[in-house]
Amino acid sequence: MPAIISIVDVAKTYATGFQALKQVNLDIRRGEIFALLGPNGAGKTTLINVVCGIVRASAGKVSVDGHDNVTAWRAARALIGLVPQELTTDAFETVWATVSFSRGLFGYGPNPGHIEKVLKALSLWDKRNNKIMTLSGGMKRRVLIAKALSHEPRILFLDEPTAGVDVELRRDMWQLVRDLRETGVTIILTTHYIEEAEEMADRIGVISKGELILVEEKAELMRKLGRKQLTLQLHHKLQDIPAA
């Protein structure tokens, strides 16, 4: 089965000279949950923004379900839902209005039935007429997910989806991601937490200083992480192993 996202030799260098991405190559399988693991500043968000067409790569190529994200950007972007890390919403709009408006931005006509389905799936239906400024941080994050799903994308990017949320809401988010995958949505999430990647992902990629240094099936990576090794560096060569 061909990859739904193909990233080939992608690099990004900003005008300051900072190289955020270095020759990244990655294929995302259709229908999988892929976790991109790395510390702050590793390049996770930059890579997402390049794939989504928000940031232009300095080199390389990205295709989304066969559509080049530069020459066929509209078709590529229509397949993608993006949930940013920051809680960026219109505080004075209602939940229903902001989710419906997001659908229209992608050129889709009104579909109250779909919006209702999304809001109910995210436990937002009883908040549909509430202004976003009245919602908790966890509910605002759910609104961002609803906006990302408003135009029925086949790919969903979640940038640090559980950042700043409590343990209970984090587990609710994990279940939501699993439920979305069951509907056929391909999911790519970024995280700092190995336990989050272990809980949800089919495959895990590790990025550091702009380089994708590892891509593994989750089970294989967990097996490797389970092995412990201690290395001692000696100042002088030992002739014999000391007695205990």
Please describe what each predicted stretch is:
Residues 1-7, 11-23, 73:
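A short, flexible loop at the N-terminus of ABC-type nucleotide-binding domains that lies
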Residues 52:
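Helix-to-loop junction immediately C-terminal to a conserved catalytic motif
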Residues 100, 104-127:
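Conserved ABC ATPase "signature" region
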Residues 60-71, 75-76:
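Conserved ABC transporter NBD signature motif
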Residues 156-159:
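Catalytic Walker B motif of ABC-type/P-loop ATPase nucleotide-binding domains
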Residues 150-154:
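A short, proline-enriched helix->beta-strand linker immediately N-terminal to the Walker B motif
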Residues 174-244:
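ABC transporter nucleotide-binding domain
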